[in-house]
């Protein structure tokens, strides 16, 4: 591996969502140029089905988020130059088994509901998982109504198995649909 275009931190979020911890560990073995290689190899060499290491991953995620809030990171916390601190925190939440926290980071800190949807679909391996349904109901639909985006609203209702509302939102004004839904 050579340079930033082969940086294992850039793909960790997606590989952790797929459950490919060993693959990320292998990528870190090849990243001899990265200053955090030794620390990450040691950390990723642990068994994340063990509650102790799940907790360690979650603590690292919260520490990364607090760095963003307070501007300083304690020296014992893993900090890597990913696209963003929040994205790497979401990766550690997935490593620790907390899809809900990873999705909340995507929605609240990153403002990226599409990334949250992608993570929920991959981790839950379904278009009908509880986390995906929650994202659609509590994030996507409000955005669709707020911006008057009929297509987004129709897509969201379709995934919620509300085919009647999915069609109606395309034909009737968004505000009238909102009144009939709630």
What does each of the following model-derived ranges do?
Residues 1-182:
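Extended alpha-helical solenoid/arm regions of large eukaryotic scaffolding proteins
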């Amino acid at each position: 591996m050579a340079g930033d275009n082969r940086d294992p931190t850039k793909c960790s979020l997606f590989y952790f969502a797929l459950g490919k911890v060993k693959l990320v560990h292998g990528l870190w073995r090849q990243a001899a140029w990265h200053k955090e290689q030794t620390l990450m190899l040691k950390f990723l060499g642990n068994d994340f089905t063990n509650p102790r290491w799940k907790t360690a991953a979650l603590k690292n995620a919260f520490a990364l988020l607090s760095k963003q809030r307070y501007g300083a990171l304690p020296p014992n916390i893993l900090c890597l130059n990913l696209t963003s601190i929040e994205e790497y925190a979401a990766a550690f939440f997935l490593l620790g088994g907390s899809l809900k926290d990873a999705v909340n980071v995507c929605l609240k800190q990153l403002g990226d509901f599409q990334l949250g949807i992608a993570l929920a679909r991959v981790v839950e391996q379904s278009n009908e998982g509880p986390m995906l349904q929650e994202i659609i109901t509590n994030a996507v639909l409000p955005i669709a109504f707020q911006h008057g985006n009929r297509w987004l609203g129709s897509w969201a209702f379709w995934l919620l198995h509300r085919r009647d509302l999915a069609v109606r939102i395309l034909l009737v004004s968004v505000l009238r649909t909102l009144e009939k839904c709630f």
